[in-house]
Amino acid sequence: MGQKTNPIGNRLGIIRTWESRWFAKKGYADQLIEDLKLRKMLKDKLYHAGISKIEIERVGEKVRVLIFAARPGIIIGKKGAEVERLKKEVEEKTGKQANIEIKEVRRPELDAQLVAENVALQIEKRVAYRRAMKRAVASSMRFGAKGIKVSCAGRLAGAEIARTEWYREGRVPLSTFRADIDYGFAEAKTTYGIIGVKVWIFKGEVQPGQYINYNY
């Protein structure tokens, strides 16, 4: 089971918490779709800032958006001008009072989503996929990861038949629920088609009853 499912979803309520935190008696589907659209809009607009994840909290007529980014300066802009612009866009989209907070990802080499996007970007720039994978693995292990697995799937190197190749170093215990495993997915759009990149990073074990608190 651990091999097939999303490691983040698999650990919800055990050592991880939800990225959308709100309750709704009615209009649940509308708010869920609004969250998805909001995440897509912010991700597309702030792609160059290296967005790791976006958390959304709703209380009454207020929306709180937490953006975890590798380069927060790009989002903030001069004297916070960009944040104000984003705030207005979020308020227009949701029709509620918005509060935007930016948090820095201090070690992007240990963030699975950012590592996956970096590998995908290298593949798009025609770097050999094996070299991109090995470089990402070496970098994460150097920064203190207990284990990492990187997988690339698609028409690798322009092959006629699509295949999957992966590279792993260290331990990645996907079936151990107390294991803090971060997961990220990105797509590389090449002339041959789309190549999917998946990354699993094992950072250690969490004691029962404790939740992961990343030092962002």
From Swiss-Prot:
Q: Where is the KH type-2 domain?
A: 38-106
Task: Spell out the GO cellular component terms annotated for this protein, sorted alphabetically and separated by semicolons.
Answer: cytosolic small ribosomal subunit
* Key word Ribosomal protein present: yes
Example of a GO MF term: structural constituent of ribosome
Gene3D superfamilies for this protein: 3.30.300.20, Ribosomal protein S3, C-terminal domain
Give GO terms for biological process.
translation
**Keyword presence, RNA-binding:** yes
Database matches in SMART domains: KH
Query: What are the alphabetically sorted keywords of the record?
Result: Ribonucleoprotein, Ribosomal protein, RNA-binding, rRNA-binding
Query: What SUPFAM superfamilies does the record point to?
Result: Prokaryotic type KH domain (KH-domain type II), Ribosomal protein S3 C-terminal domain
Against PROSITE patterns, the record matches this protein to: KH_TYPE_2 (PS50823), RIBOSOMAL_S3 (PS00548)
> Cross-referenced NCBIfam families, in alphabetical order?
rpsC_bact
Its annotated function is as follows: Binds the lower part of the 30S subunit head. Binds mRNA in the 70S ribosome, positioning it for translation.
Similarity section: Belongs to the universal ribosomal protein uS3 family.
Q: How does it assemble?
A: Part of the 30S ribosomal subunit. Forms a tight complex with proteins S10 and S14.
User: What protein am I looking at?
Assistant: Small ribosomal subunit protein uS3
Q: Say which species the protein is native to.
A: Thermodesulfovibrio yellowstonii (strain ATCC 51303 / DSM 11347 / YP87)
> Which gene underlies this protein?
rpsC
